[in-house]
Each structure stands twice: as structure tokens, then as C-alpha cells.
Design a protein with these regions (language model features):
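Conserved Switch II/interswitch segment of TRAFAC-class P-loop GTPases
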Residues: 89-111, 119, 129-130, 142-147
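Switch I (G2) and immediately adjacent beta-strands of P-loop GTPase domains
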Residues: 44-82
């Protein structure tokens, strides 16, 4: 939407990994943290003993010297309020589609929810103008035996009026294509910001860097 600004003037973009529970968001972020050398600082995780995210994971990462706060949302349906909180002010989204065929309905539920909460940002009314917030898809778990075909995912994106969405086929447990997808989303995020500035679109001044506050009881 609009990056925040640190006291030293550095712009900080916010990138969010969205998608159903078990889709691989935390696994992918942990891969970026542990294996790709892009992280600056620790990986913060608020999760339950079984590894399900309760609120978010958060990591500060640098891509070509640009700083990103990267969050994952808690995918379980009951954590809607937490997702809404994390989504605020997002500059770019990576949707983790669980390719396991059995998870089809969960993917659809999650995409619909995102469009309800953020549809005005990730959809464009005019095909010639890119949406305010770029979104890419990671079709994750491509190593599993019974996976949804990429064409079926494309059909869903077309029906959702996002026909040009870029899809990466990922395996988060082995890191396959995770960095490529991440760097692509990060670049889209920065590119979109400068496009907005160049075209004179209303870009509110960058606000101070913030973190989501924990939901109340
Ligand atoms: N086979 C396979 N398993 C994966 C892959 N990515 C993640 N997993 C597994 O899927 C399970 C769920 O992964 P998480 O990363 O915790 O999923 P999540 O999207 O963060 O889930 P929530 O925190 O509930 O939203 C874990 O057991 C992972 O090891 C993958 O690409 N292939
Ligand atoms: Mg998680």
C-alpha cells in the first residue's frame, strides 16, 4: 500500500504470505531465514505446540538493499481477526496454494477471504492498470503425489479476475523455487511503488515503521 519509513529514512516494505493452514507459509519463511542469507535479524514466530501459527511469523529481510518486513498469517479459519490485523498496510502478497488435492476447498476459502478483505487492492478494475498491491501465487507441495494441476489454479485465478497472476511451483520443505518466488514478489512490490510515484497516483507519505499489536483476549 505504502511503505513505512525508519528513523534513518530507509523505506520498509511489507510483504505477507497468505493462504490456508498447512499450505507451507511458515516453512517457506523459515527457508528464507535459514538458507538464503536474506534475513537481517531473528525469525519471530507466534505458534502453538503443534507448529500452527497463532498470530504471525515475522522476519526482516533485505533484497538488493531494500528492506522488507515479511509476515505469514495464521491460516486456520478461526484466526480471521489475526489475519485481518496482519494484512493491514501490506505492499505485496504471496498466496501459498496447498497443491494437495484434498486441500482444494481450503484454498478457495482462503482466496475468497482475501478478496473480501483486500479485493479492492489486489484486483484492478482496468486491465491496463496493475492492481495497487501485487500478488503472486506459490503452488506449494509440488512433491506430493496427488496434486492439483496448474491449469486448475489458473482457472480459479481467471474466475477471480486475476488472470495475469504469476505462479511459481514450489516445494517449501526443500526450498525449491522459494527464493525465486520471494525475490520476484519483493521486486514487484518495489516496482509498483515507483510506478505509483511516477504516474502521480496518490501515494500517502510513508508512516513510521510499526508492528501488529497482539489481539485482545
Ligand atoms: N510435502 C511437503 N510438505 C510441506 C511443504 N511445505 C510445507 N510442508 C509441510 O506442511 C506442514 C504445514 O506447513 P506450515 O509451513 O506449518 O504451514 P502454514 O501455512 O504455516 O500453516 P498455518 O501456520 O496453520 O497457517 C508442515 O508439516 C510442513 O513440513 C512442501 O512443499 N511439501
Ligand atoms: Mg504457519
Amino acid at each position: 500500500m505504502c511503505p513505512s519509513r525508519r528513523a534513518d529514512g530507509t523505506l520498509v516494505f511489507k510483504l505477507v504470505f497468505w493462504g490456508p493452514s498447512m499450505g507451507g507459509k511458515t516453512t517457506a519463511l523459515a527457508w528464507v531465514y535459514e538458507k538464503e542469507g536474506l534475513a537481517s535479524g531473528q525469525l519471530q514466530s507466534i505458534s502453538d505446540p503443534t507448529g500452527r501459527t497463532l498470530f504471525f511469523d515475522r522476519l526482516v529481510a533485505k533484497v538488493s538493499n531494500v528492506v522488507f518486513q515479511v509476515y505469514t498469517v495464521a491460516g486456520q479459519r478461526r484466526h480471521k481477526f489475526q489475519r485481518q490485523t496482519v494484512l493491514k498496510g501490506t505492499d505485496a502478497l504471496v498466496f501459498f496454494w496447498d497443491s494437495d488435492q484434498a486441500q482444494w476447498n481450503e484454498n478457495i476459502y482462503s482466496l475468497k477471504e482475501l478478496l473480501q478483505m483486500y479485493g479492492n487492492k489486489v484486483l484492478s478494475s482496468d486491465i491496463k492498470i496493475p492492481p495497487e498491491v501485487p500478488l503472486i501465487v506459490c503452488a506449494n507441495k509440488r512433491d506430493l503425489p496427488n496434486i492439483t494441476g496448474i491449469d486448475k489454479i489458473k482457472d480459479v485465478l481467471k474466475a477471480a479476475k486475476m488472470p495475469n497472476t504469476v505462479i511459481f511451483e514450489t516445494v517449501a520443505i526443500t526450498g525449491t523455487n522459494v527464493k525465486r518466488a520471494f525475490v520476484y514478489a519483493a521486486r514487484e512490490c518495489v516496482l509498483r511503488h515507483y510506478q505509483k510515484l511516477k504516474s502521480g497516483e496518490q501515494v500517502p507519505p510513508a508512516s513510521p515503521e510499526t508492528e501488529p499489536t497482539a489481539p485482545g483476549p
